[in-house]
Amino acid sequence: MAGMDMGQHDSEKNPDATKAANDAMSDHDMDMSMSAHMYMTTLRPASPADEKRAAEILAQLRPAIEKYKDYRVALADGFKIFLPDVPQPHYHFTNYAYGFEAAFEFNPAHPTSLLYKKTNDGYELEGAMYTARKLATEDDLNARVPLSVARWHKHTNLCLPPKGASLQQVDLKEFGFRGSIATQEACEQAGGRWYPQIFSWMVHVYPYESDPSKIWAH
């Protein structure tokens, strides 16, 4: 079964996938390393060279996204709000052209998504998200953002409800990112639809954090 990519959200055609995606985004406030539906890279030993590379990424990112502190500028520049009407701890404003570019090359000034929190009068910029293609190796990821500095993650082991099932028919404790089903065998037994991985590899960065340990933290 074909996987779903960051650049192909379609809430009307695939509402189950949309709900799962929202659950995945919401799970960023949880301990993702403990989730059966999340894989995170292991931190590699620190090195001065990696710290220098990470600093260079931030030096390119900060001025590139400074204007997007006004979220309306981000919208005007082609960023689209993912699930704007669904309450979320963080809202992803995604630039699908940058997402496509990220499948082939890494440009620190072109994050796939901007991360905002909702405010009374709009949105406040918190950070950004870089992506890499699904099939990228950990060495590929390390070449972009050092694995000694940041932990990339991917969303895995997703079992969606049977196609056409209504919410009344679905046990939400079993399906989706918050569900207990985390193997293909169990998913097939439940009549669900199995996705070994959805979306690309991702890594969040919060360049305005004063605490260095929180800049690359989830």
Question: Where do the model's predicted regions map?
Answer:
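Compositionally biased, proline/threonine/alanine/serine-rich low-complexity intrinsically disordered stretches
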Residues: 1-27
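Primary mode marks residue(s) on the alpha4-beta5-alpha5 output face of response regulator receiver
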Residues: 17-114, 118-218
